[in-house]
Amino acid sequence: MNIDKFTAHAKSVIASSQLLAAKNDHQQILPLHLLSSLLSEETGIIQTLINNTGGNINLLKDQVQLELNKIPKVQVEGGGQVYSSAEALKVLEKASSIAKDNGDSFVTIERIFEALTYDNTIAGKILTNNGINNKKIATAILQFRKGKKADTESAENSYDALKKYGRDVTELAESGKLDPIIGRDEEIRRTVQVLSRRMKNNPVLIGEPGVGKTAIIEGLAQRIFSKDVPESLINCRIIELDMGALIAGAKYRGEFEERLKAVLSEIKESSGEIILFIDELHLLVGTGKTDGAMDASNLLKPMLARGELHCIGATTLDEYRKYIEKDAALARRFQPVYVSEPTVEDTISILRGIKEKYELHHAVRISDSAIVAAATLSNRYITDRYLPDKAIDLIDEACSRMKIELSSKPEELDELDRRIIQIKIELAALKKENDEHSKKKIEHLTTALEKLESQSYDMGAKWQAEKSKLQQTQKLKEELDRSRNELERAERDANLAKASELKYGIIPEIMKKLQEAESMDNKGLLKEIVSESDIASIISRITGIPIDTMLSSERERLLVMEQKLRESVIGQDKAIKGVSDAVRRSRAGIQDINRPLGSFLFLGPTGVGKTELTKALAGFLFDDRNAILRIDMSEYMEKHAISRLIGAPPGYIGYDQGGVLTEAVRRRPYQVILFDEVEKAHPDIFNIMLQILDEGRLTDSQGITVDFKNTIIVLTSNLGAEILVNQKEDEDTYKVKDEVMEYVKAVFKPEFLNRLDEIILFHRLNRNNIHDIVKIQLESLKKILLAQNIILEFDESALNYLAEKGYDPSFGARPLKRLIQREIQNNLAKMILAGEISSGKTVKINSKDKELKVTMS
């Protein structure tokens, strides 16, 4: 007997029988040990053979274990060596003989099992007593192998390969596990046309990720199941190839190719009744490729060309170009079927079609307004993904969120229960006190507790009743779904009696009960309908763009936005109004959706509040003054520095890192972007800003389109500042606008200026403005000191002194900050370090004899 002529699985069975004998302290390997190992093998081949011969594997296992327990145990010091008995060797010799007689090059596990039926020991008797004999097993092996010979060391892997390495999509359609497919008739028709060709009948579905390529295959499977296809495809089955399972565990060279060949030969033998579906078709190119080995695509090519293999592929445009088109021999064997992204209207139809499946899964109801919102809002705000995938994700997540809310305690009831616990803790503490005040407090809290417990009990009972009603509705929906599947099956099997009973009796009755349950007033604690606002809320969480329903407090806040901004920015009312109007337009949803929310060029001398207004705007929108993307344009004075904004071109360092501007906006699409000191940048930088301002988009160095439609763009500049500085104090700034614009037009091209929403002039600050700014600066200092528990007080004389001394029409408010540092903060720092000012003290600032006094009280 040559052990090398046994397959890897057969060797594994012999080795495990040896381990079993050693574990049980048996002196030698008996046929019983071989039978026990065969009954426990992992491939499932032996179990299938036993089932096909009418045996029961669990009964066999129990009987074998009983007999193993009867074998005498002999313990040898040091473990000893376990040898094969003459009977076991005879079984293996018989297996080799049977394999040879049947034309097998290798001995497989089923041949060892067949040899055991010839055994005269207890193992053979157990099989005979269970009705398993050599004739039955030989017939079962013949049927199971379907004429295949064991000619490789891993022959067992090639049995029933399609079942191991594939998924029957037609079977899923039959059992009703696939979502209904709406539309896509043209793509399905084109796929059927290609499949019906004589040669090269292999379509490949090409489209962006998430447009529904796999759904088209599921739609075709449903049509095959319902016989809504040409005669040539009526008896076909679609099997999806699992490339992961095919590759997994292929340790030895040639094992992967052997598995794939087994799959292909099964398809070939089916005489065109099996259509192979390969999702992510590009994985074929290079899969299994090692030194001197062929990759999967080369194994497929001959069969594809001859029309022996019906194959449908699916891949994305990028991957098709990158992998398939490079292999011209493979590309010509496939016929491309392009799958475009559906329109918003088509997406709404698709969502309406699959709505019932999601309602059933999540046990909630989806309103039609939620479906329309999911399609329209995802199309507008989620720009880096494709319909219908992104819209379906929104519906799914909104339903999931509502399902979690339904299964948890309502907020009102939760608050009541927390209040009850709080009162009980207070009562427990007060009962330890004996004073009159505590007794009164106990009496008061006891009354409140009784009232709250009564409310909690009533609300809890109401919640449980509502929950029970929802569960009842869910059961009815599940029953209706089951009945519809049964009706389809009955109609297909021509079981007219059952079909009529379901169609005219059971289904109408369930629908009536369901309508009654859903029509009952449900204005209680639980909300079970997914609405438009739920979808908007999910998008807001994903993108950070506030499109969910505005609270009344936010509406009021937006109407008084100018007042809020004036608290930080003094004396620039026209600029504040222009920015406020842009924000209100965007939050009201009436701005041009293809442009940024607002684009402004702020012109004015230094220190008048251009950058400060941008920070105040960020503070108003995001409650964080630093939530702005600030790009200092003085860093982009050289032409080559421009590429930093959108990313370095291919071949340059940093190509894979993305651009400063594009990456920041991709990660946070709703923000204020400040291009500071814009006139200092290289003129070419404005060319890339043209499409941002006009179309609200920009393509980075890697070809990714970044959406700027939810940004506010602010550009600041000092152009024409000398004109504004030399202007009379009370003169209207807009009288000199034409002169300032001459400077602006000399630097910026007309096509750039024409794309801005507004060019806003900041006038120079007058003495009254400086007085107000002093107050803001001192209030800011007051907050800083308050954090150290030091109180700061100042009077009007201090304000007047600082305003007079810090006023400089050429430099705006910036000298004022330096003055406060010099006159106040420096003195305070010395006093704190010297220990003169400590926590809890009050510091007073006033002016006397044209000097600023800092005193402590």
Curated annotation (Swiss-Prot):
Its keywords, alphabetically, are: ATP-binding, Chaperone, Coiled coil, Cytoplasm, Nucleotide-binding, Repeat, Stress response
Where does the Clp R domain start and stop, copy by copy?
Answer: 3-147
| GO CC terms, sorted | cytoplasm
Record region (NBD2)? 554-764
Gene3D superfamilies, alphabetized: 1.10.8.60, Clp, N-terminal domain, P-loop containing nucleotide triphosphate hydrolases
Do the record's keywords include Lipoprotein?
A: no
The biological process GO terms on file are: cellular response to heat; protein refolding
One matching Pfam family is AAA_2
Q: What sections of the sequence does the record tag as coiled-coil?
A: 392-523
Q: Where is this region: NBD1?
A: 160-341
Can you state the subunit structure given in the record? Homohexamer. The oligomerization is ATP-dependent.
Q: What does this protein do?
A: Part of a stress-induced multi-chaperone system, it is involved in the recovery of the cell from heat-induced damage, in cooperation with DnaK, DnaJ and GrpE. Acts before DnaK, in the processing of protein aggregates. Protein binding stimulates the ATPase activity; ATP hydrolysis unfolds the denatured protein aggregates, which probably helps expose new hydrophobic binding sites on the surface of ClpB-bound aggregates, contributing to the solubilization and refolding of denatured protein aggregates by DnaK.
| Name this protein carries in UniProt | Chaperone protein ClpB
Species of the source: Rickettsia conorii (strain ATCC VR-613 / Malish 7)
Gene that this sequence comes from: clpB
